[in-house]
Design a protein with these regions (language model features):
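NAD(P)+-binding Rossmann beta1-loop-alpha1 motif at the extreme N-terminus of oxidoreductases
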Residues: 1-62
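Residues at the starts of beta-strands that form the adenosine-phosphate
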Residues: 5, 30, 118, 145, ...
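A conserved regulatory-domain signal marking ACT and ACT-like small-molecule sensing domains
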Residues: 288-314
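Rossmann-like NAD(P)-binding element
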Residues: 58-88, 92-93, 99
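Interdomain hinge/lid region at the active-site interface
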Residues: 209-278
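Internal alpha-helical scaffold of NAD(P)-dependent oxidoreductase catalytic cores
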Residues: 140-227
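Rossmann-like NAD(P)(H) cofactor-binding subdomain of soluble oxidoreductases
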Residues: 81-133
Length: 314
């Protein structure tokens, strides 16, 4: 690949990990970074993720051959508007890393249509409840889906260039329509986060009268609610940019709960057994057992005896 300049706006977990992956495959590329947080900028520089950093988004944009917007969705749309007013390189590729796609693609087609640029929406489906450049890792995207949602501004050759640029991620590239992306992720990503936060809120309220709730919360409860630690601002933005699909998932779930409640009330042993068995069989058939990368960070618990030098044996 010829020497290029890549500008990553947003040096959080996703943006910083993208920088590491690009650096791994293409050490010759100049990587510029934007972030409002001085701490994230310093971490990115110290770890060699980027060559130069700025807290002024417009400063590096005209220098870039590729611009990746790795910021919250509303900020991504605002930056797209800003890019429309800047003197960018001809044929520059603009992409993003947002968790919803329809509004972002629509914004690009609206504001960038008269610019000599190429735009392709993208969603790297990997992450963690941990945040910031300090949590970034070069293996974050390994075997995870990296979804491209092309637009009317995605000219021939754009996807191939992006796949080559991002080859160091070792991700699984796939192309999907933006609207279909938002429908599918409402089920397997957005709704589960609502459920995890709801479970935590319910448990917290319940523990006010039943103190043992917190003591007994382990195992399955911990696994189901881990993602409730995710950054609230990001998830607020996701829900507000994919409302219809998410509301439909919530209605579906209400219906499911009503059916389970009716079976319990009727003491319908067969219906209850079939409910759990359907869930069990569906889980076995899904690919979640076969893929890595989607949740690349885990909490590791080790029992250490309370004695001198015990930790040295780990």
């Amino acid at each position: 690949m010829e020497r290029k300049t890549v500008y990553i706006a947003g040096l959080g977990l996703i943006g910083a990990s993208l920088a590491l992956g690009i650096r791994r495959a293409h050490p010759e590329i100049e990587i510029l970074g934007y972030n409002r947080s001085e701490e994230s900028r310093q971490v990115a520089l110290e770890r060699g993720m980027v060559d130069r950093v700025t807290d002024d988004f417009a400063a590096f944009a005209p220098l870039a051959d590729v611009i990746i917007l790795a910021v919250p969705i509303k900020q991504t749309i605002a930056f797209i508007k800003d890019l429309a007013e800047l003197d960018l390189k001809e044929n520059v590729i603009i992409s993003d890393a947002g968790s919803t796609k329809a509004e972002i693609v629509a914004a690009a087609e609206k504001y960038l249509q008269n610019k000599p640029v190429r735009f392709v929406g993208a969603h790297p489906m990997a992450g963690s409840h941990k945040t910031g450049a300090k949590a970034a890792h070069v293996t974050l995207f390994e075997n995870a889906y990296y979804i491209f949602t092309p637009s009317s501004l995605t000219k021939p050759g754009t996807l191939e260039e992006m796949k080559d640029l991002l080859s160091g991620l070792h991700a699984r590239f796939i192309q999907v329509d933006a609207a279909e992306h938002d429908r599918v992720t409402s089920q397997i990503s957005h709704f589960p986060h609502i459920l995890a936060s709801s479970l935590m809120e319910q448990a917290a309220a319940y523990s006010q009268e039943h103190e043992l709730t917190q003591s007994f919360a382990a195992g399955g409860f911990r696994d189901m609610t881990r993602i409730a630690e995710s950054e609230p601002g990001m998830w607020t933005s996701i829900l507000l940019t994919n409302p219809q699909a998410i509301l439909e998932r919530l209605e579906d779930f209400k219906d499911q709960l009503d059916k389970v409640a009716a079976a319990i009330e009727a003491k319908d042993e067969t219906a209850i057994w079939e409910f759990f068995n359907r869930g069990r069989q569906s889980r076995k058939q899904m690919e979640i057992h076969k893929r890595a990368g989607v949740d690349s960070f885990y909490d590791l618990f080790i029992e250490v005896p309370d004695e001198e030098d015990a930790i040295l044996g780990i």
